[in-house]
A protein has these predicted regions:
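Ubiquitin-like/PB1-type beta-grasp interaction modules and other compact soluble beta-rich domains
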Residues: 1-66
Length: 67
């Protein structure tokens, strides 16, 4: 299955959930300060069990503090 993550092509054998992708990217399955959008729709953390499908475009946004 092929999908896009933050503008870069990715592939996975079999199904993968949003939570699994977030964990792979951040090291934590439910990190604070992280927002996820799939195909332009924000996915609440309570729905991160959503299975990414072939062709999905996913964005992970991480809040950072700065000044």
């Amino acid at each position: 299955m092929d999908y896009t993550l933050n503008g870069k092509s990715r592939s996975s054998e079999g199904y993968i959930t949003v939570a699994a992708v977030v964990k792979a990217e951040t090291g934590d399955a439910s990190p604070k300060g992280v927002a996820v959008a799939v195909n332009g729709d924000v996915i609440p953390a309570s729905d991160w069990s959503y299975e990414v499908t072939d062709g999905d475009e996913m964005d992970i946004l991480i809040a950072v503090q700065g000044g």
